C-alpha cells in the first residue's frame, strides 16, 4: 500500500466526511461558502505528519525546501491548467510556502484553506465570465488556437489575459459541440447548463474537500 492510500485510510479513521447538498443557481460570490478547518482535521494532520516524518521508508526533512514542494503541488492541484488564479494571487501565497511544514505539524492549515477559498472565488468569477461570453455571436471563421495543456504555462498576469484564455476556452467548448452536430441554440443551452452546474458545485464544497486535497499534496510529494 503506497503512502497516498495509507494516508487516505488514516484520514478516514479520524475525519468526518461532509456531504454535498442541493442548491439553486448561484449568482453571487457570497453564496460560495468560506471554508474553515474543522477540529478533527487538525488532529489528523498532526498524527499523519508525525507518523510519516518518523516512520516513512523515504527519509525526508519537513523543512522549508520540502514545504515549498508541497505548496507547489497543492497549488497545481487547485489550478492545474493555470487559468483560474492570477500571477499576483500565486505570488501572494508563495511568500508563505515555507510555512507549510509548520502548519502540517501543528494541524493549523491556514494557508491551505486561504488559498482554496481564493481559488473558489476566482473559479466563480471565471464561470460567470464564461456565461457572459456565451451571449456573444458565435464565430468559427478565424484561425484561433487553444492550448489544451497549460500546466507548464505561466499564470495570467492580469484579468485581461485571463479573460482571453476563457474566450478561447468557451470557443473551444462551442466548437466541440458544433462538431457533434448541435446547432447554436443547443450549444448555448448545453454550455449554459454545464457552466451553471460547475458554479453550483462550488457551493457544495466543504472543509473535508480542502483537507483531503492538502493531504493528497503531502502524500504524493513524499511518495
Regions flagged by a language model, labelled:
Residues 2-21:
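Gram-negative bacterial Sec-dependent N-terminal signal peptides
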Residues 4, 20-223:
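Flexible, low-complexity junctional segments that flank or bridge functional domains
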Amino acid at each position: 500500500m503506497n503512502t497516498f492510500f495509507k494516508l487516505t485510510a488514516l484520514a478516514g479513521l479520524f475525519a468526518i466526511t461532509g456531504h454535498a447538498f442541493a442548491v439553486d443557481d448561484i449568482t453571487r460570490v457570497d453564496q460560495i461558502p468560506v471554508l474553515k478547518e474543522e477540529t478533527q482535521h487538525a488532529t489528523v494532520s498532526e498524527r499523519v505528519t508525525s507518523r510519516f516524518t518518523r516512520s516513512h521508508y523515504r527519509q525526508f526533512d519537513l523543512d522549508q525546501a520540502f514545504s515549498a514542494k508541497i505548496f507547489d503541488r497543492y497549488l497545481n492541484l487547485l489550478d492545474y491548467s493555470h487559468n483560474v488564479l492570477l500571477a499576483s494571487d500565486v505570488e501572494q501565497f508563495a511568500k508563505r510556502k515555507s510555512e507549510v511544514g509548520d502548519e502540517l505539524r501543528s494541524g493549523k492549515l491556514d494557508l491551505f484553506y486561504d488559498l482554496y477559498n481564493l481559488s473558489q472565488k476566482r473559479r466563480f468569477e471565471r464561470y460567470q465570465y464564461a456565461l457572459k461570453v456565451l451571449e456573444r455571436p458565435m464565430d468559427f471563421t478565424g484561425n484561433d488556437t487553444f492550448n489544451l495543456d497549460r500546466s507548464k504555462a505561466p499564470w495570467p498576469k492580469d484579468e485581461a489575459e485571463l479573460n482571453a484564455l476563457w474566450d478561447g476556452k468557451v470557443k473551444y467548448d462551442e466548437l466541440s459541440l458544433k462538431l457533434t452536430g448541435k446547432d447554436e441554440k443547443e450549444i448555448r443551452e448545453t454550455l449554459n447548463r454545464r457552466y451553471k452546474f460547475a458554479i453550483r458545485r462550488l457551493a457544495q464544497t466543504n472543509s473535508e474537500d480542502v483537507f483531503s486535497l492538502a493531504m493528497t499534496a503531502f502524500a504524493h510529494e513524499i511518495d
